[in-house]
A protein has these predicted regions:
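Conserved AdoMet/S-adenosylmethionine-binding subsite of the radical SAM
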Residues: 161-168, 173-303
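Flexible, acidic/Gly-rich N-terminal and inter-domain linker regions that tether
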Residues: 8-120
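Short, structured patches in soluble enzyme cores that scaffold and shape functional sites
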Residues: 113, 124-128, 138, 157, ...
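Ferredoxin-type iron-sulfur electron-transfer modules in oxidoreductases and energy-metabolism complexes
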Residues: 151, 155-163
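Canonical Radical SAM [4Fe-4S] cluster-binding loop centered on the CxxxCxxC motif
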Residues: 115-152
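Basic polycationic patches enriched in arginine
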Residues: 4-6
Length: 303
């Protein structure tokens, strides 16, 4: 099934409502509105997109093919590039690096750089905290403090050291991506559009508990890979691990996924944390195989 095109309304607001606004995180349509507000020609939107997402500048004055007057107007209207460097970085012995960025609600958010032979993956956050309350998740225990804007998501991608060498992106950091879908879709549009970073959607994976309406929207409007948190094939057991089983039963999630084709470019995977003595025996294995029978997918077992 080919994805249906969907017009994303950018989270852009005029300066009469807010004191300042970052340019990163704005789609081409959002940048066109910026250009119109500042009296710039419409083609300036693509120029700004190139500076922001390809050349990755950090200051408006670096946009040298915009006139001095246009750059002054951007600053006058309170626009900034909006890039913020990581607050801290902590490297593990395996080369993994955890970066902390300023988040929302007074809480920092994490991004994790994961090197692996010829790949360089960045795991990004979509929220500060999480509302899903999974019993095994440290983020859930911190409570929910707010959702990131598209600017907050894009800043992670653009501002980690060596960001130009990234090969893959996974939405598997703090938060539930489908609980903050509009900014996530805006970020994906920026990353995969020709006017933006021009990545193939095959380089992006979104991990989710499976909010049904939002999952359908993601499937219909993008071609990114999907990873579903499952952790048990038994509803009662999964409910104890993941309270969202009550609102979004895994059987309904799988029923929705069966309506889509994962046999070609798009990949479907299921994330399964193995808890010793709880969900790691032969009975669980057979039931999981039965549940997923006929789906073109893989299961990632996590210890």
């Amino acid at each position: 099934m080919l994805p249906r095109r969907r017009v994303i309304t950018p989270t852009y607001t005029t300066m009469s409502q807010f004191e300042s606004q970052p340019l990163i995180g704005l789609t081409l349509e959002g940048l066109r509105k910026v250009a119109a507000e500042c009296g710039m020609p419409p083609f300036s939107a693509k120029q700004m997109a190139q500076w922001l997402y390809v050349k990755r500048i950090t200051e408006i004055d670096a946009m040298t093919d915009l006139s001095k007057r246009a750059r002054a107007k951007l600053a006058e209207h309170g626009f900034t590039v909006g890039r913020q460097q990581p607050l801290t970085a902590a490297e593990s012995s395996d080369g993994t690096v955890k970066y902390l960025f300023e988040g929302v609600g007074g809480r920092d958010i994490e991004s994790v750089y994961i090197p692996d032979r010829d790949r360089a993956t960045l795991c990004v956050s979509s929220q500060a905290g999480c509302r899903m309350n999974c019993s095994f998740c440290m983020t859930g225990r911190q409570g929910f403090h707010g959702s990131l804007t598209a600017a907050g998501i894009m800043n992670q991608i653009l501002s980690v050291p060596g960001s130009e060498s990234l090969t893959n992106l996974v939405f598997m950091g703090m938060g539930e991506p489908l609980d903050n879908l509009p900014p996530v879709l805006e970020a994906i549009e920026i990353i995969t559009s020709k006017w933006g970073m021009a990545w193939s959607p095959k380089r992006i994976t979104v991990s989710t508990i499976g909010k049904l309406r939002e999952l359908r929207t993601l499937l219909d409007t993008t071609k990114v890979h999907i990873a579903i948190s499952i952790h048990s094939p038994y509803p009662t057991e999964r409910l104890a691990l993941m309270p969202v089983e009550k609102a979004f039963p895994i059987k309904d999630v799988i029923s929705l996924l069966r309506q889509y084709d994962f046999s070609h470019q798009r990949r479907l995977s299921f994330e399964y944390i193995m808890f010793k003595g709880l969900n790691d025996d032969r009975r669980h294995c057979l039931e999981l195989a039965h549940m997923l029978k006929g789906l073109d997918c893989r299961v990632n077992l996590i210890r």
